[in-house]
Amino acid sequence: MGHKRMKSLNEQIHQTLQGMEGFGRSKYEDKKAGIQGRYIYSYSTMRTYEKHCRYFADFVKGSPAVRAALGHRPRTLEECRLFIPAFIRYQIGRGLSTYTVKMEASALGKLYGEKLNLELPRNARTEIKRSRGAAVRDRNVSRKNNSELLNFCRCCGPRRSELEKLSAKDLRVINGRFYVSFTRGTKGGKPRLSPIMGTPGEVLRAARYLKTLTGKNHVHSGLDVHSLRAEYASRVYRESARSLESLKGRRICKQALYVCRGDKAGIVYDREALLAASRALGHNREDVVAGHYLYKEE
């Protein structure tokens, strides 16, 4: 009988991650059941995680320090586990973005089935450049030809994945007001009902545009979705915000006001309005909206 060949590290990575395939499952329902950590819910996430786990495999296979520590080139994923911190430090040293490093840590945590205790860089809001001003890619999206799409995004705040899957059946009218029901392509599979915001004319245009969508919508790669979501967040916040002067001096002041820190130190928001904007966007954290969406309010 011939010797059974041991799978390569890349084959082990592929097999392990494929065993977690949960395409079509509801992450929202799994989260409520406490089992969301067992699955990978989208093809794009699977592809991204496998790609970056392979970068880790390349690192350990090519590292003289790893070979010296083991006495041989690593053969199994378990042998590689100890060198995850060294890989993360190496990636940070290469100057990779905080987002990329954290994503690689998440990919490796999924591969090994545990939350890794790693020292990761913190996101600095001031370093974020994307969607914070005019970019070359914006020139590829005609404002004239896409005026209805742009108006819709400003009025409704969909994510790119949500916009691709919206259809006419997602329009809701409650007490005379238009809403969008987001149930497909949402982050974590969590559904939400978001008000359509804008002037009466803009709202009607957005509602009509939604009726033209089919659930299989092409979204231009150059569309700056985050910036449009920021405009939507500002609209929701402004509608819900109370006068800060009316909240000061009360016993509820600390609970009613959100005071920013870091580079936005001193800026104060109405906490209740922040939560309204956060939920309309599909988040549930006031700090996310204050730090990453209301920059147009500064």
Label each PLM-derived region with a short phrase.
Residues 1-39:
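N-terminal DNA-binding module of tyrosine recombinases/phage integrases
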Residues 4, 85, 89, 93, ...:
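Flexible interdomain linker/hinge and immediately adjacent N-terminus
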Residues 37-115:
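Non-catalytic DNA-binding core/recognition domains of DNA-processing enzymes
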Residues 46, 161-166, 277:
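Alpha-helix N-cap/helix-start motif at helix boundaries, enriched for small hydrophobics
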Residues 131-160, 261, 268-274:
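Basic, Lys/Arg- and aromatic-enriched nucleic-acid-binding interface segment
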Residues 132, 165-203:
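Conserved tyrosine-mediated DNA breakage-rejoining catalytic core shared by Y-recombinases
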Residues 186-232:
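C-terminal catalytic core of Y-nucleophile DNA break-rejoin enzymes
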Residues 220-274, 283, 288:
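Short basic/aromatic active-site micro-motif
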